[in-house]
Amino acid sequence: IKIIPYLKKKSEELKEHFTPTIYAIKLMSIIMKKYPAVYGYIKFGIYEPKDGMDICCLVNVGQGNELANTTIKNCEQKNMKEITDELMDNVKLLRERKNKDQNKKMKLYRLIPTFIMGPMTQIFSYISSIGIKVKSLGLKQFEFGSCVITSIGGLGIENSFVPIPPVSFAPVILTLCSKYERNIRNEKGEIETKTFMKMNFTTDYRFFDYNT
């Protein structure tokens, strides 16, 4: 499938702005549905299966100095329009500082010394990754879902593999790179300019080892 023309066509048909990120979320939900190994989690060294394809997107909510995450639950049950509406609503709340869970976490981080922040983040992330919710701290179950999607298109990087953040405990991270143009020879032997965009995967091999 030619992603860019496809998104343009779908946007015109449904009068909705579908981005590569939206396409990637839906694509990953389809892939994970076929390969259950990538949407489980590891609890105390033991692989546990998990219901539903939850996919996390990283969001820049400040002036480049604050990164938040928002997770779309059960993506396999939603169409692209539903995913778009939910993602846009979540991003709006984050950028307007109206997301209660994010505000609780940021308030806590402002109160603790810097040298404690790293270990505390790792502990909280692990608690979330094994399905424990702490409402008073704004900590949700499976905060980063089973896949993290990040877009580096705004940085002008055409090809890159992003490492999985240790705090995410996610099996997969998908990187959306910058669009670029190349001259290619078509089926008629003519030279034409086409737009390309690379989508690169980084995986945690342990999830696959547990299922082989």
Feature roles, as predicted:
Residues 1-212:
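C-terminal catalytic/motor cores of large multi-domain enzyme assemblies
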